[in-house]
Amino acid sequence: MHRIVSVVAPLGFRLQAQPLVQSRPLSSVQDVLRRTPLYDFHLAHGGKMVAFAGWSLPVQYRDSHVDSHLHTRRHCSLFDVSHMLQTKIFGCDRVKLLESVVVGDIAELRPNQGTLSLFTNEAGGILDDLIVSNTSEGHLYVVSNAGCRDKDLALMQDKVKEFQNRGLDVGLEVVENALLALQGPTATQVLQAGVTDDMKKLPFMTSAVMEVFGVSGCRVTRCGYTGEDGVEISVPATGAVHLATTLLKNPEVKLAGLAARDSLRLEAGLCLYGNDIDEHTTPVEGSLSWTLGKRRRIAMDFPGAKIIVPQLKGEVQRRRVGLICEGAPVRAHSPILNTEGTVIGTVTSGCPSPSLKKNVAMGYVPFKYSRPGTQLLVEVRRKQQMTVVSKMPFVPTNYYTLK
């Protein structure tokens, strides 16, 4: 989901910044960048800061990108994702408001249950992806992408004004908390030491407000962007450094930056907004049909429904697929060809997989080439390499569900 810089590098590696989602070392832009509450904390721990989406964020720390990636898969890592836009939608008509701009069935969410959903336009394109939680405190808690902050806020604020002008009860508030992601197989074991709530009773895509290592008012959501078990903690900004410092005292926990986050999400088959999905991609083309609520499909009452719903019943022209590639690492914008050498699509994300020690990628191909096992070619530095369409995720996910 979350839009991050595409800065993964070959195994063994020299870190490279990819130009599609801009990130650059801090220089003259430093003074105009926003800083998270953990900025000084990152510097003190060797964070290599880059400019991303108007923020100064760590791309990695003293450990290599690959070390951080593998540590997350085997133990757990702490990511600062405070640049994400956090909002509350409240009022009696809050569900009706959000359902006017997203494709999901928000009304069916139980108290403190969440889901991934999509903002769409009337042409069926994806404006952004978001996580929405139906809190037991009487509001919807929404987390969306930093790179889409302005357009997401404008979309929601315009809808609030429209609904209020119609006499409906809605409101919107930006949450100025920090947001920390603790990800990996031992993440909740680490967290359990600092909370009184039983983490075994908090399954994937549910949340609760609790005190975490002495910091009150934290919303803990069992979700993440790595494919591993883990949580995202919305923490009051004044408590962010204390919480991060306390978590880091546990030997299971290491800091990780944008580079590891990108390769982890790609192994998990998760989309990067702006690369893998955008305003010209429909949920069906993006292999995200599961985000469309069944009730919403029948009612056809979400933006772009007249375009999107018919695609569910027939073949779309193109489809997002996974690719396992031979040869050199494959990057975004690399052409995809059929075995006759005709260009049929484009890679949208790619990197060497530290877990698999293979090159993995995502891209779009015509529907007839989207079946797993289909042999194709990719072009890297003007040379053609064999690739095969693969099921995703590339690495099995480990989300926690109640037995």
Swiss-Prot record:
SUPFAM superfamilies: Aminomethyltransferase beta-barrel domain (SSF101790), Folate-binding domain (SSF103025). GO terms for molecular function: aminomethyltransferase activity; transaminase activity. Its main location: mitochondrion. Substrate binds at E232, R261, Y399. One of its GO terms (biological process) is glycine decarboxylation via glycine cleavage system. Residues 1-28 form a transit peptide. One of its GO terms (cellular component) is nucleoplasm. Its EC number is 2.1.2.10. The keyword Mitochondrion applies. Keywords: Aminotransferase, Mitochondrion, Transferase, Transit peptide. It comes from the Eukaryota. It is an enzyme of class 2 (transferase). It catalyses: N(6)-[(R)-S(8)-aminomethyldihydrolipoyl]-L-lysyl-[protein] + (6S)-5,6,7,8-tetrahydrofolate = N(6)-[(R)-dihydrolipoyl]-L-lysyl-[protein] + (6R)-5,10-methylene-5,6,7,8-tetrahydrofolate + NH4(+). It is found in: Mitochondrion. InterPro entries: GCS_T, GCST_C, GCV_T_N, GcvT/YgfZ/DmdA, GcvT/YgfZ_C, TrmE/GcvT_dom1. The modification N6-succinyllysine is found at K368. The keyword Electron transport does not apply. The glycine cleavage system is composed of four proteins: P, T, L and H. Belongs to the GcvT family. NCBIfam families: gcvT, PRK00389.1. The glycine cleavage system catalyzes the degradation of glycine. This is Aminomethyltransferase, mitochondrial.
